C-alpha cells in the first residue's frame, strides 16, 4: 500500500510502483505503472487542458484565465523572437513554448504537499536536455554541413591558440547537454528539500505545546515566504530553460 505521509525528506522524490504487470511467460517489470508515470500523465493533461480549454468564448474581453494564458504566450513569443530572431524563430516557437509549459506545470504540481517532484529527477531532466542538445546539433549539421564546426573557432583567434580554444569550446558545447537539465533538477531538489526539512521541524515544534505553537508562528511566516519564493523559482526555472533552449538553437542556426 502507498504510504501517504512523508517520513523522510527524500520520500517526495522516490518512485513507487502503483500497478504491476505480471505474466508467467513474459517479464513485464519494465512496464510497471509508477508515480513517475502517473504524474507525467497528470502534467501532460494539465498542459493540454490549460491550452485547449482556456478560451474567451468569442467575447471581446476574455476571462482572467484567458488573459493570463495570452500573457504567457506573448511573453514566450517575444523571448523566442528576440533570442533566435531572423525568419526561423517561428519554426521553433512551438517547441520552446511546449517545453516551457511542461516544466512550468510540473514545477507547480510538485509544490503540492505529498505530491511527486517530476522535474527533480536528474535522469529524466538530463535526458530531456540531451534530446534538445542532440536535436540542435543535428539541425546545425544538416543546415551547414562541415561549416558547422566553425562554431568552435571564435573569430579573430590567433593561430597558435586555435587548438586550445577549440578544445575549450568543444567541452563547453558538450557540457550543454548536462548543464541545462542539471541546473533545473538541482534547484528544484534543493528547494523542495529545504521546505520539507523546515516544515517538518516547524510542525514538530508547534505540536509540542500551546506555548511552542505560539512561538512557532514567527518562523512560520518565514517558511511562508520561502514557499512564495519557491513558486517564483518554479516559474523562473521554466523561463530560464526556454531562454537557454532558444540560445542553443540560435547558435546552431546562425553559428554565433
From Swiss-Prot:
This is ATP synthase subunit a. It comes from the Eukaryota. SUPFAM superfamilies: F1F0 ATP synthase subunit A. Pfam families: ATP-synt_A. Mitochondrial membrane ATP synthase (F(1)F(0) ATP synthase or Complex V) produces ATP from ADP in the presence of a proton gradient across the membrane which is generated by electron transport complexes of the respiratory chain. F-type ATPases consist of two structural domains, F(1) - containing the extramembraneous catalytic core and F(0) - containing the membrane proton channel, linked together by a central stalk and a peripheral stalk. During catalysis, ATP synthesis in the catalytic domain of F(1) is coupled via a rotary mechanism of the central stalk subunits to proton translocation. InterPro entries: ATP_synth_F0_asu, ATP_synth_F0_asu_AS, ATP_synth_F0_asu_bact/mt, F0_ATP_A_sf. The chain crosses the membrane at residues 33-53, 92-112, 122-142, 148-168, 188-208, 209-229. It comes from Kluyveromyces lactis (strain ATCC 8585 / CBS 2359 / DSM 70799 / NBRC 1267 / NRRL Y-1140 / WM37) (Yeast). One of its GO terms (cellular component) is proton-transporting ATP synthase complex. HAMAP family: ATP_synth_a_bact. Residues 1-7 form a propeptide. Its main location: mitochondrion. Keywords: ATP synthesis, CF(0), Hydrogen ion transport, Ion transport, Membrane, Mitochondrion, Mitochondrion inner membrane, Transmembrane, Transmembrane helix, Transport. It is a multi-pass membrane protein. The lineage of its organism: Eukaryota, Fungi, Dikarya, Ascomycota, Saccharomycotina. Belongs to the ATPase A chain family. The keyword Signal does not apply. It is found in: Mitochondrion inner membrane. F-type ATPases have 2 components, CF(1) - the catalytic core - and CF(0) - the membrane proton channel. CF(1) has five subunits: alpha(3), beta(3), gamma(1), delta(1), epsilon(1). CF(0) has three main subunits: a, b and c.
